[in-house]
Structures are given as structure tokens and as C-alpha cells.
Amino acid sequence: MMIQTAVAQAKTAPAGPGPWSIKDLVDLQYLDELMSIDNLDVWFCSLVGSIAIGLSGIFPLLVIPIEAGTALKTEAGCQKLKKLLSFAIGGLLGDVFLHLLPEAWAYTSSPGGSHRHYCTQGLWVIGGLMSFLTLEKMFPDEVGDPETKTSFQRTTSSSSDLSSQFSVSPQTNGICSNNNSDSKPKTDISPYTQPEKIKTSGYLNLLANCIDNFTHGLAVAGSFLVSRKVGFLTTFAILLHEIPHEVGDFAILLRAGFDRWKAARMQLSTALGGVLGACFALCSQSQHGAENATTWILPFTSGGFLYIALVNVVPDLLEETNPRNSLLQVLLLFSGIGVMALLSIAMD
């Protein structure tokens, strides 16, 4: 009330320098409206909904029992990971063509208008794909150095040669003896092993997820600006859509070299994108502001997901030579698309 009175007085006062200008008072009024009781409820519900969607990143821990490291290097672990990757490819393709792009088209479609916006969104898809290609070119995965590999083999061979010079006889009570030197205890030499390098594709997938969560935050906050009922329904629909998507993303992170717990932590960190998206929509205080951002963010994210699915993950599946495993991978790919199709139909 005090701010409204001050604004009215400022409008009737003669123009001239003073401690308060009309612009300053209007900004104060905007902040007062932004932090009103009704808006605080919208802020709370939007942030809680965005965080809940981000917490879906830990769901794969409950359904993926395999471990990274030695388990994934076994034949059984490798086949399990390839099955998850097949489902991940289907989920990503279904997400792009059945959810992200149709939603972007719905924001920009206008009856009787030009179709130039479709070309613009197509360019954003290409831009997202090329951006991820550029990032992977800038930060390529390091291939093992032949010289390092040779020195490692030389170290192990010299260690075995050193061990072969000694022999253990019963007369020495377990003490190594040698004809050319005095008796000495046997020395165990073990080569140094470096930790596994995380592939760039894992970080690209996290970047795409962060941008995708930003759009989810925009949708959640924009829905709560309409009404609490619409907001809760939108949050629930996004959660249903995200659960199979997170399982596929988790498999991609395991393939990139993350262990299960680190992959879960990195998935949770992408929830920050959803919080930022919700804050952006609430600060704009308009659905139109969120929609304008969504019209280019959704196709850009689609290009990133297409790059991850078709460039980073599909080549691993093409290495499969067993016809039975190949057929199973194709069926899982279609099942991933089918799950996304059912969820898209259910959300309409």
C-alpha cells in the first residue's frame, strides 16, 4: 500500500531530480508483487516440483544392479549394459520425436501463418547436433599411448624375469635362494594401474540433461502460474516421462566410465537446471516468456540427444555379431520407443 501511494505521488509530482524516480518505485512495486503471499506459494510449489523431477535421477539405482569397472568388462556385464543402452537409444529417439519436437511445434504453430518457424526450429536441431559435435572435437577421449603401453609391458616382463632368477627350496624354509647371490626374502613387484578415464560422451549427456531439466522447470513453473491443479498434473506427467529417460541416461553414464554412485550424483546435479528454469519462468511472471525460451531450447536439446544416441551409443551396438543378441537389442530399442509413445499419449 505504501509503494502504491508513493507511485501515485511520484506520478503527480513535477518532473525533476529527486531521491526517488518513477522507475525506482515501479521496480519496488514489481518486487513487492513478486514476493507476495500468493506468489510465494507458486514459488514454493514450482521449486519443489522441479527438485522432485531432478530427484528422479536416483531411480535407476533401484533397477540397475550392475556395477561399473570389472563387472562391465566381463561378458555377462557387457551384455547387460548393451541391453540397457539399446533401451536408452529407443528412449532418446522417442523423447525427441514424440515429446520434445511436437511440444516445440505446438508452441509456435499458428493457423494460417507461415511455416518459417518450422525451418527455424530445424536449424536449432542442427545447431544442437553441431554444438555437441564441436564439444567432442574440442575435448576428445584420450586413446592409450603406445609408448606407455610398451613401458607397462616392459615393466611386467622384467618383473617376471626377476622372479624367475629365484627359486624356493624346502631346505631354505621358504627363503629364496640363488646361485649368484646371498639368500634374500622374495620381493613382490606389482605394476601401477591408472584409473579409468571418463569419456566425453558422458559429460555431453549431462549437459543435454541439464538443458532438458531447464525446460522442465519452465513447464512446471508456467503451469503453477496458471493454477495449482495444472501445476501438479504437469509435474506428475513429467515425472512419468522422466523415469524411463533417466534409466537410459544412467546406462549411458555407466558406458562413459562412471560408477553407479558417481553417476547418480551427477544425475542429481543436473536438477539445478530445473531450478534455474523455474526461477526464470517465475521472474518473467508470464507463460509467454517461458514459451519463447522453450521454442528454441527444446529443438536445441533434441539435436544434442540425437547426437548422443546415434553417434556415441549406436556404434557400440553395431559391434555385436551374435544374431540372437542383435535381435534382442533391436527389440529393446523398439520397447524404449514404445514406452515413450505410451507416455506421450497418456500425457495428452
Swiss-Prot record:
Residues 67-83, 140-219, 284-294, 348 are lumenal. Residues 170-182 have a biased composition (Polar residues). Keywords: Cytoplasmic vesicle, Endoplasmic reticulum, Golgi apparatus, Ion transport, Membrane, Transmembrane, Transmembrane helix, Transport, Zinc, Zinc transport. The chain crosses the membrane at residues 46-66, 84-104, 119-139, 220-240, 263-283, 295-315, 327-347. It catalyses: Zn(2+)(in) = Zn(2+)(out). GO terms for cellular component: cytoplasmic vesicle membrane; endoplasmic reticulum membrane; Golgi membrane. A motif (XEXPHE-motif) lies at residues 241-246. It is a multi-pass membrane protein. Coiled coil: none annotated. Residues 149-169 have a biased composition (Low complexity). The keyword Translocase does not apply. One of its GO terms (molecular function) is zinc ion transmembrane transporter activity. Residues 1-45, 105-118, 241-262, 316-326 are cytoplasmic. GO terms for biological process: intracellular zinc ion homeostasis; zinc ion transmembrane transport; zinc ion transport. Its main location: Golgi. Residues 144-192 are annotated as: Disordered. It is found in: Golgi apparatus membrane; Cytoplasmic vesicle membrane; Endoplasmic reticulum membrane. Belongs to the ZIP transporter (TC 2.A.5) family. Functions as a zinc transporter transporting Zn(2+) from the Golgi apparatus to the cytosol and thus influences the zinc level at least in areas of the cytosol. Homodimer. This is Zinc transporter ZIP13. The gene is slc39a13.
